Amino acid sequence: MTDERRDVGEEVDSVLVALADPTRRQLLDLLAAQGEVTATRLAERLPVSRQAVVKHLAVLDAAGLVSGRRVGREVRYAVRPAALDATARWMAALAADWDRRLADIKRVAEAAERDSR
């Protein structure tokens, strides 16, 4: 495996791990809908504490899905779509591979059915 493919694989892994948690998915939805938002504002919309929101945002940040920008005493978080785009490309390639395999199986099955007549 090349270093570039390994790097993409690690990026996809961290994104999928981050997205595995429903609270983190909710945070991404809120950030996508509202733009830059503080952890305090996000916590007001979720059934978790501000501290829990900050921990979830740290996981999302480590995966490259969000970024924080300090404005005075606050940190405002926003979605960073690049990591999600890379994951979507990986998933699309995986889906295309499975589509090709299923088409091959269908072709073999149809040929076997024709030959049995």
Question: What are the functions of these language-model segments?
Answer:
Residues 44, 61-62, 67:
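Alpha-helical residues within the helix-turn-helix
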Residues 2, 6, 10-49, 71-85, ...:
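N-terminal helix-turn-helix DNA-binding core of bacterial DNA-binding proteins
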Residues 84-108:
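C-terminal structural segments of small proteins and small subunits
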Residues 57-58:
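Short, hydrophobic-biased segments on the C-terminal half of alpha helices
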Residues 107-117:
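Short, charged, intrinsically disordered terminal tails
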